[in-house]
Amino acid sequence: MCIRDRLTTILTYSIAIPLGITAGRHQDEWQDTSVQIFNYITLATPGFVFYILGLWLFGFTLGWFPISGSVSANASGFWGVFGSRIYHMILPAILYALITTTSTVQYLRTGIVDNKVEDYVRTARSKGVPENVVFHKHILRNSLLPIAAFLGNTITGLLSGSMIIESVFS
């Protein structure tokens, strides 16, 4: 697994876990609706279209990221080349992470919503345990277990989806 795939995995979970927690904790409120709209848009948009739009917006229009290559021509020395490689990896990694967050967000949201009504949560609330403790110790802990198991599926998806990313950003 290359560095970009590792960066993408870290970004995927860094984006997906807070979004899933927000959507699950605020079920049927505006936060949940916003996360669901984001999920549906990223799920319905084909990857190559999403990548080309991101490349056009952040590469051509705004000029924040390079549009091709893997190292700048004027990079010299180890740290210059290393920094240039990271700079060239950021846009593909972010765009791919945004696409791959959808399933993780949905799994986590569904787990939180399902665990909210379990007997052990109801028992903890009836004992007078503060809601924040109930959420972190009972609901969130049990909802994150499927996400940890889903990591293997995410890694295999990254390896297969790298071909599309490489063809768009080459």
Language model feature labels by segment:
Residues 1-2, 41:
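Hydrophobic beta-strand positions within the nucleotide-binding domains of ABC ATPases
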Residues 4-31, 47, 79-170:
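Alpha-helical transmembrane segments of integral membrane proteins
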Residues 36-45, 49-101:
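Membrane-water interface segments at transmembrane-helix boundaries in multipass membrane proteins
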